[in-house]
């Protein structure tokens, strides 16, 4: 499981999404200089999206023995992360004058990049495994023909 780069990339991506549960989304500066932090989990749509992304990342890690399925799950998770990033960007442009946003808003973009790279690596692993199986089968056929 821990021998493939795909697993590490997906794990880092999943940890980035998981860290968003503990980070603040934005801060609102009050009239007397007091700040109110808004966490990601306080907004229900963000919470649902992060749970879906966390589930996708964990499922991708656990499907390490099936590289084609892992590639599909990584690609789907990456696309969901891009959608989440667009959603965060829309909120940023809507509330940029009222709130001070956290740098953690860029985590989905970084995680999406890692997921896309992991998807590509999983496809390469799958094709390599298929080629290895095919070459072993052809080697067995060739050795039986020479006898």
Q: What positions do the PLM features span?
A:
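Cytosolic juxtamembrane helix at the C-terminal end of the final transmembrane segment
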Residues: 118-142
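Hydrophobic alpha-helical membrane segments
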Residues: 73-90
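Hydrophobic transmembrane helix segments
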Residues: 15-43
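Interfacial helix-start motif at the membrane-water boundary
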Residues: 37-55
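Cytosolic juxtamembrane helix and N-cap/initiation of the first transmembrane helix
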Residues: 1-20
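Juxtamembrane helix-break-helix junctions at the cytosolic face
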Residues: 58-71
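Alpha-helical membrane-associated segments of multi-pass integral membrane proteins
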Residues: 99-126
């Amino acid at each position: 499981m821990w021998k493939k780069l795909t697993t590490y990339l997906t794990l880092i991506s999943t940890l980035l999404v998981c860290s968003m549960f503990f980070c603040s989304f934005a801060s609102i500066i009050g009239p007397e200089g007091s700040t109110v932090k808004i966490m990601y989990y306080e907004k229900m749509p963000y919470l649902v999206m992060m749970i879906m992304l966390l589930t996708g990342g964990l499922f991708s890690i656990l499907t390490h023995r099936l590289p084609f399925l892992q590639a599909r799950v990584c690609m789907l998770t990456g696309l969901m992360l891009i959608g989440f990033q667009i959603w965060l960007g829309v909120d940023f442009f809507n509330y940029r004058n009222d709130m001070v946003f956290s740098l953690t808003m860029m985590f989905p973009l970084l995680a999406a990049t890692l997921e896309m790279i992991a998807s590509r690596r999983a496809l390469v692993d799958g094709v390599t495994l298929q080629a290895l199986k095919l070459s072993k089968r052809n080697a067995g056929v060739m050795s039986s023909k020479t006898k």
